[in-house]
Curated annotation (Swiss-Prot):
GO biological process: regulation of DNA-templated transcription; regulation of RNA stability; regulation of translation, ncRNA-mediated
Protein name: RNA-binding protein Hfq
Sm domain ranges (all copies): 8-68
NCBIfam families per record: Hfq (TIGR02383), PRK00395.1 (NF001602)
InterPro entries in alphabetical order: Hfq (IPR005001), LSM_dom_sf (IPR010920), Sm (IPR047575)
CDD domains, alphabetized: Hfq
Annotated signal sequence range: none
Entry-linked SUPFAM superfamilies: Sm-like ribonucleoproteins
Keyword Transcription regulation: no
Subunit structure: Homohexamer.
HAMAP family reported for this sequence: Hfq
Annotated PANTHER family: RNA-BINDING PROTEIN HFQ
Amino acid sequence: MKPINIQDQFLNQIRKDNTFVTVFLLNGFQLRGQVKGFDNFTVLLETEGKQQLIYKHAISTFAPQKNVQLELE
């Protein structure tokens, strides 16, 4: 049985749904936008047509504007 990767499922679902998210960084700063892509180390966030590449180790929390449906089985 393949292990479930909740992080990748979550990020992929908010990317596919174009869900707006608030990204809280470890330094307390907040970024708002849409996830356009991600890999093992970074998340590409788009805000008002501008892109920001954020390193995952700097992220504390993702807060989507709506609930995200995941398949955990």
